[in-house]
């Protein structure tokens, strides 16, 4: 069973849109493109009868059916579709707090686990300085090769951040990881935080 919420206001707005399509049985399909990545986007599309996929979860609502993409469903946990009126008419919003969160566990490949901790624990802190760090590769000796960007590229504190923050966090979370290495060109200082 899906944990997505479609508010009454959103339901009524969508029902009105669907009624204008002149297609009996038309519903909506909710899905996420590139789920579990920083590029994830939550989408709602019209879904004519027969366009739904057999593996979709059908969510029967008062006036129409919402089909939830099976691959996206776990990422739509706690999602809320709402409609708010304003002076310009109104706006449909989709808040899906788990859309960009990778689904990993102890058996996931090491690169997926590293990316998970970079996205959920490390990059949110670096974002306050306008920076981020990305995984480039995991080399054979168990070293994660990382690259800084934004305000972290060229920052005078990058070495401290790498060793005291990033490496310490990753080594605590991923026991088989042996260390991290920075391949950033820190001579580029235009956007550096420090």
UniProtKB/Swiss-Prot annotation:
Cofactor binding annotation: Binds 1 [4Fe-4S] cluster per subunit. The cluster is presumably bound at the interface of two monomers.
Pfam name, any one: NifU
Task: Give the protein's cofactors.
Answer: [4Fe-4S] cluster
Matching entries from InterPro entries are given as: Fe/S_biogenesis_protein_NfuA (IPR017726), FeS_biogenesis (IPR000361), FSCA_dom_sf (IPR034904), HesB-like_dom_sf (IPR035903), NIF_FeS_clus_asmbl_NifU_C (IPR001075)
Molecular function terms in GO for this entry? 4 iron, 4 sulfur cluster binding; iron ion binding
For binding [4Fe-4S] cluster, which residues are annotated in this chain's numbering? 152, 155
Keywords from the named record: 4Fe-4S, Iron, Iron-sulfur, Metal-binding
Name the SUPFAM superfamilies for this protein.
Answer: Fe-S cluster assembly (FSCA) domain-like, HesB-like domain
Q: Which GO terms describe its biological process?
A: iron-sulfur cluster assembly; protein maturation
The record's function comment reads: Involved in iron-sulfur cluster biogenesis. Binds a 4Fe-4S cluster, can transfer this cluster to apoproteins, and thereby intervenes in the maturation of Fe/S proteins. Could also act as a scaffold/chaperone for damaged Fe/S proteins.
Spell out the HAMAP family in the cross-references: Fe_S_biogen_NfuA
Q: How does it assemble?
A: Homodimer.
Family that this chain belongs to: Belongs to the NfuA family.
Record protein name field: Fe/S biogenesis protein NfuA
